[in-house]
């Protein structure tokens, strides 16, 4: 269910602040969002997979924390990120 190396590299290139940037909140949120979207398709077929559902909830929680951090540090970057990712906030 995880992302391939090429998908990860593409996300890092799109959302990174600089070359090779993997630690910025934008990159981390984009990677988590991509993983979450992949897992949602998995749960359409496997409704009783509660073990993976716990991992999904953990990823959603981590994304929420990173978004809250980014919103507190720089509101413009936060708003740009949620617009680019198409999140509901």
UniProtKB/Swiss-Prot annotation:
SUPFAM superfamilies: S15/NS1 RNA-binding domain. One of its GO terms (cellular component) is cytosolic small ribosomal subunit. It comes from the Bacteria. The keyword Electron transport does not apply. PROSITE patterns: RIBOSOMAL_S15. Keywords: Ribonucleoprotein, Ribosomal protein, RNA-binding, rRNA-binding. GO terms for molecular function: rRNA binding; structural constituent of ribosome. The keyword Transcription does not apply. One of its GO terms (biological process) is translation. Belongs to the universal ribosomal protein uS15 family. Part of the 30S ribosomal subunit. Forms a bridge to the 50S subunit in the 70S ribosome, contacting the 23S rRNA. One of the primary rRNA binding proteins, it binds directly to 16S rRNA where it helps nucleate assembly of the platform of the 30S subunit by binding and bridging several RNA helices of the 16S rRNA. This is Small ribosomal subunit protein uS15.
């Amino acid at each position: 269910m995880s992302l391939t190396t090429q998908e990860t590299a593409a996300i890092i290139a799109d959302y990174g602040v600089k070359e090779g940037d993997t630690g910025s909140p934008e990159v981390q949120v984009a990677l988590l969002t991509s993983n979450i979207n992949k897992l949602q398709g998995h749960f359409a077929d496997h409704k009783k997979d509660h073990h993976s559902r716990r991992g999904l909830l953990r990823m959603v929680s981590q994304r929420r924390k990173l978004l809250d951090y980014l919103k507190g540090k720089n509101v413009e970057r936060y708003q740009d990120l949620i617009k680019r990712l198409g999140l509901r906030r």
